[in-house]
Amino acid sequence: TYLLKKSYQHKTLKEINFKDLWGDKGVFTTMRILGKPTKILFFNSHIKNLIKSLKIYKLNRVGIKKDILKLIKLNVDNTKSYDHLLRVAVNNKMISVSLRERKTPKLEFNLKLINHKRIDPELKNLKYKLILKYLSKMDNTTSDVALCFKKKILESGTSNILFIKKNKIYSPSKNIYKGVTYIFFKKKIGKIINK
């Protein structure tokens, strides 16, 4: 369930009809927002990764970080209590901001294996239409997809996957997005073996 969906033109920041931008050339980040007063988990790291990806795709125009921060501030109500997911998506024409209800995963959770590797998987780009097609048919509190390529499990549709064997933790070495949560766990765990 969406609490908010808005899109804005670059530079002028004029509000326009909402587009989620899935499938476009562009990037996005999704951040957990919770509590009152509002806290966005790992906010600086998410924004840093977003700007880094914009630079790689040559979408990093002058002032874009300032505009993104302004739009987040505009759309987050500090008088509300949140437990939502805040998504910021950017292409060459607009910035889209949305807030949706966060669904808490249940302990009994399963993965549907699909033969798919994301385009430029090291980046959090908007080429997610096939993944979203599968996810839309699932109860996302109990199920996700696991992307497989050349007989290797890479990542889920929404998260990294870590494998545990004999008290050692493993992760694919390539064709995955090593996001903010992955980096957080790597620091906490101390060592993730890449294979």
What are these model-predicted stretches?
Residues 1-74, 91-195:
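Helix-start/capping segments and mature chain N-termini
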Residues 78-80:
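Non-catalytic, solvent-exposed interaction/assembly segments
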Residues 82-84, 143-144:
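Short N-terminal helix-loop-first-beta-strand/juxtamembrane motif that initiates sensory/input modules
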Residues 87:
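Dinucleotide-binding Rossmann-like beta1-alpha1 core, especially the glycine-rich loop
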